[in-house]
Amino acid sequence: MTIAFGRFIKEENDLFDIMDDWLRRDRFVFVGWSGLLLFPCAYFALGGWFTGTTFVTSWYTHGLASSYLEGCNFLTAAVSTPANSLAHSLLLLWGPEAQGDFTRWCQLGGLWTFVALHGAFGLIGFMLRQFELARSVQLRPYNAIAFSAPIAVFVSVFLIYPLGQSGWFFAPSFGVAAIFRFILFFQGFHNWTLNPFHMMGVAGVLGAALLCAIHGATVENTLFEDGDGANTFRAFNPTQAEETYSMVTANRFWSQIFGVAFSNKRWLHFFMLFVPVTGLWMSAIGVVGLALNLRAYDFVSQEIRAAEDPEFETFYTKNILLNEGIRAWMAAQDQPHENLIFPEEVLPRGNAL
């Protein structure tokens, strides 16, 4: 029998292989094929946001000051959404609205669509980066799957919701106080806190925080060696030879506390993955529903009885009145181009007034 020794010589001028070798090379900051999407999009999204919050006014779109140049601070500066009249235009710099004029493009709100679209693709690129690295080091892709949850929330809130409404104008602007205003808008116009998908989202996020705190404390509790002095801070000693974390000890502890406890590390950590990811996905689904103007729970019988009986009021009916007040105030303030005027007699008031 003849055995031939040698190696397969690949075509040295294969551009794909040259690119693949350079992109996936082991270096301090991994680039990868996903980096071709991630790094440019993240750079443009962050650069657009810093540029907008520093220099660009919202006077022409919202009648507001929104930049450091105009006197805003970190909490009040924002990259604001385009004007309502521009509907769902992509607001390309070379498009019919700005016609290549950068100053006009900024005044019309072009930076918002620029940041939103590059931000969305940047987040997707980051998820693909986790897929790519997991495949390279032979890990399962649960990190990327988990990161799909914040991507779903971003896309549903910043893109799908305004697509279901009359324009990008009704999306959140990119700023701290601007996001708070958007939350108030969601409550007043959609009664978001009474939406079951919001409830599932809150349960997921707060439940995940609770699980994270419990898990971290339990691991720290059982990390240092038994019988070596009950000093909490020994858990932070970096010179310990090996990990002494005991799943059995943790299981016995929580069995005594709650009567039940996780007995399997895989199930425990899957549950910690499942709770926040499912909560965020449910929130995203709920926001898609709001884009279509689907309503939350309505307890009409309580509203009718409150209207008929001055002595009957519930927390629900009080919240409905509060929502009416938000709408009456915010519609006129938030959409000055509509010239909305609400006479005193239509403004909401509680039964006590």
From Swiss-Prot:
Lineage, top ranks: Eukaryota, Viridiplantae, Streptophyta, Embryophyta, Tracheophyta
Signal peptide boundaries: none
UniProt keyword Transcription regulation, yes or no: no
Binding site for Fe cation: 215, 269
PTM-bearing positions, type N-acetylthreonine: 2
BP-aspect Gene Ontology terms: photosynthetic electron transport in photosystem II
Note: 2 of the reaction center chlorophylls (ChlD1 and ChlD2) are entirely coordinated by water.
Recorded topology in the membrane: Multi-pass membrane protein
Parts of the chain that traverse the membrane: 41-61, 125-141, 153-166, 208-228, 279-295
Pfam families: Photo_RC
Catalytic reaction(s) noted: 2 a plastoquinone + 4 hnu + 2 H2O = 2 a plastoquinol + O2
Identification of the protein by name: Photosystem II D2 protein
Any one GO CC term of the record: chloroplast thylakoid membrane
Phosphothreonine modification, residue list: 2
Localization of this protein: Plastid, Chloroplast thylakoid membrane
Keyword Metal-binding: yes
GO function terms (MF aspect): chlorophyll binding; electron transporter, transferring electrons within the cyclic electron transport pathway of photosynthesis activity; iron ion binding; oxygen evolving activity
Chain sites annotated for binding pheophytin a: 130, 143
Binding site for chlorophyll a PD2: 198
InterPro entries named in the record: D1/D2 (IPR055266), Photo_II_D1/D2_sf (IPR036854), Photo_RC_L/M (IPR000484), Photo_RC_L/M_CS (IPR055265), PSII_PsbD/D2 (IPR005868)
Manner of cofactor binding, per the entry note: The D1/D2 heterodimer binds P680, chlorophylls that are the primary electron donor of PSII, and subsequent electron acceptors. It shares a non-heme iron and each subunit binds pheophytin, quinone, additional chlorophylls, carotenoids and lipids. There is also a Cl(-1) ion associated with D1 and D2, which is required for oxygen evolution. The PSII complex binds additional chlorophylls, carotenoids and specific lipids.
